[in-house]
């Protein structure tokens, strides 16, 4: 609740929600991806029911996920620096133990995390400037690995940048 907030719903009661200090946007691919759909069938008898489904996967993709922490809301909710460090570790390692048939172990990895810290609660610049300071450019027309991209970041005066690598 301290990080992501909470909407309280109770029948017949009005309870105010808790605004989340942490905002995580959906990840977006740098280049178009090729989606592969695979049919799955069940070999066991199923009382005449259809037992076929599909799973979808992506052949290769480099995705950028953006997020931010609102300092004023964080202070109000009691979000601490230690909580932020746990969030950073969670972002670096979230796919490590989350495998499935469409996401086999090791098929998704976080390669790099850019973590900015502004001095003070108001910050030096809006999040859009921070987000646009990192640019991922494909080096080939059809990238097939992380090495097929050039990733650069522009310095933002007054904002501390830490880069965390997951070299696998």
PLM features: what roles do these ranges have?
Residues 1-168:
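RNA-binding basic/glycine-rich loop and surface signature characteristic of RAMP-family CRISPR effectors
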């Amino acid at each position: 609740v301290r990080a992501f907030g909470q909407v309280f719903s109770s029948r017949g009661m009005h309870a105010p929600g808790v605004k989340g200090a942490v905002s995580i946007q959906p990840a977006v691919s740098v280049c178009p991806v090729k989606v592969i759909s695979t049919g799955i069938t069940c070999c066991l008898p199923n009382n005449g029911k259809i037992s076929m489904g599909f799973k979808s996967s992506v052949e290769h993709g480099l995705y950028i996920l953006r997020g931010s922490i609102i300092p004023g809301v964080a202070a109000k909710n009691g979000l601490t620096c230690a909580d932020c460090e746990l969030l950073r570790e969670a972002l670096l390692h979230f796919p490590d133990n989350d495998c499935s048939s469409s996401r086999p172990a090791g098929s998704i990895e976080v390669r790099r995390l850019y973590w900015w810290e502004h001095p003070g609660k108001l910050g030096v610049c809006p999040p859009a400037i921070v987000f646009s300071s990192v640019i991922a450019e494909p080096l080939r027309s059809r990238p097939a690995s992380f090495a097929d991209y050039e990733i650069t970041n522009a310095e933002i005066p007054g904002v501390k940048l830490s880069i965390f690598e997951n070299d696998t």
